[in-house]
């Protein structure tokens, strides 16, 4: 299994806050925590940037990382990512921030250390483009947006 070196900027991680871990052997994502100095309220409709205390430099161009919402926050509280998915390229070297959007009608309180998103590493395939006059025919052809049926 490939390992990636993740640098931790916030000295509270590992002392006041646990190191990020995978919850189970089959977990794809690591939980990202709100490393804020005091609790904060995200008002209805508001989007805020929240530091995670982590910095990341993947370096390997065959890998990237994505920041994804936590399903329970979105379903139960209307808390999702302001950019829907955060993409971390292999050559990015900065701190990880989470854009948190309260799409509900109620204020939402973020406590210091709350788990607010998850980080997943993914393989990268870069496309090479070739201009052609047509494609080989398939059974589906150009059909889209429900063309293959409902059931």
UniProtKB/Swiss-Prot annotation:
Gene name, Swiss-Prot/TrEMBL: dut
Keywords of this entry: Hydrolase, Magnesium, Metal-binding, Nucleotide metabolism
Membrane-traversing stretches: none
Metal-binding keyword on record: yes
Class in the EC hierarchy, top level: hydrolase
Function, in words: This enzyme is involved in nucleotide metabolism: it produces dUMP, the immediate precursor of thymidine nucleotides and it decreases the intracellular concentration of dUTP so that uracil cannot be incorporated into DNA.
Positions contributing to substrate binding: 70-72, 83, 87-89, 97
GO biological process: dUMP biosynthetic process; dUTP catabolic process
Cofactor: Mg(2+)
PANTHER family reported for this sequence: DEOXYURIDINE 5'-TRIPHOSPHATE NUCLEOTIDOHYDROLASE
Molecular function GO terms recorded: dUTP diphosphatase activity; magnesium ion binding
UniProt KW Hydrolase keyword: yes
Annotated CDD domains: trimeric_dUTPase (cd07557)
UniProt catalytic activity: dUTP + H2O = dUMP + diphosphate + H(+)
EC code: 3.6.1.23
Name this polypeptide is given: Deoxyuridine 5'-triphosphate nucleotidohydrolase
Pathway where this protein functions: Pyrimidine metabolism; dUMP biosynthesis; dUMP from dCTP (dUTP route): step 2/2
Source species, domain of life: Bacteria
Stated family: Belongs to the dUTPase family.
